[in-house]
Amino acid sequence: MSQLTHINAAGEAHMVDVSAKAETVREARAEAFVTMRSETLAMIVDGKHHKGDVFATARIAGIQAAKRTWELIPLCHPLLLSKVEIQLQAEPEYNRVRIESLCRLTGKTGVEMEALTAASVAALTIYDMCKAVQKDMVIGPVRLLAKSGGKSGDFKVDAHD
């Protein structure tokens, strides 16, 4: 098992020094789900929400969240992201919305936390916009789907998970 990089020998949390690392293209994808009643999903898909376009708002929120991850998660580095993409898809057969985020940069540290934050905040935004209609929506699971670049190598979720 790998060592925790954010904990020093004394057991104290610290920000990892990435100054000696090589700049490489880094990419990460994450997903999140929001499960709801079929009527709530239909309202979103049909564009009948009185607050406006739920998907467009969630997309912008996810992009903003990726760019501000370093302000939310204490030991994350501020990153110069070159791409953030948020895809939202209604899955009526499961009464849910699937959110997939993609973050990319050329840099010295990965973008996994940015991708996870983007997907999570997009899901939270859907909940926020629809909570007046349904309070018992469920957010989750949220997970990393894939990452590439960097010293630790590539990762991809098993297709059967």
Swiss-Prot record:
The active site is at residue 128. Keywords: Lyase, Molybdenum cofactor biosynthesis. One of its GO terms (molecular function) is cyclic pyranopterin monophosphate synthase activity. It holds the Pfam family MoaC. Signal peptide: none annotated. Pathway: Cofactor biosynthesis; molybdopterin biosynthesis. It catalyses: (8S)-3',8-cyclo-7,8-dihydroguanosine 5'-triphosphate = cyclic pyranopterin phosphate + diphosphate. One of its GO terms (biological process) is Mo-molybdopterin cofactor biosynthetic process. Its EC number is 4.6.1.17. Homohexamer; trimer of dimers. Belongs to the MoaC family. Catalyzes the conversion of (8S)-3',8-cyclo-7,8-dihydroguanosine 5'-triphosphate to cyclic pyranopterin monophosphate (cPMP). This is Cyclic pyranopterin monophosphate synthase. It comes from Salmonella dublin (strain CT_02021853). The lineage of its organism: Bacteria, Pseudomonadati, Pseudomonadota, Gammaproteobacteria, Enterobacterales. The gene is moaC.
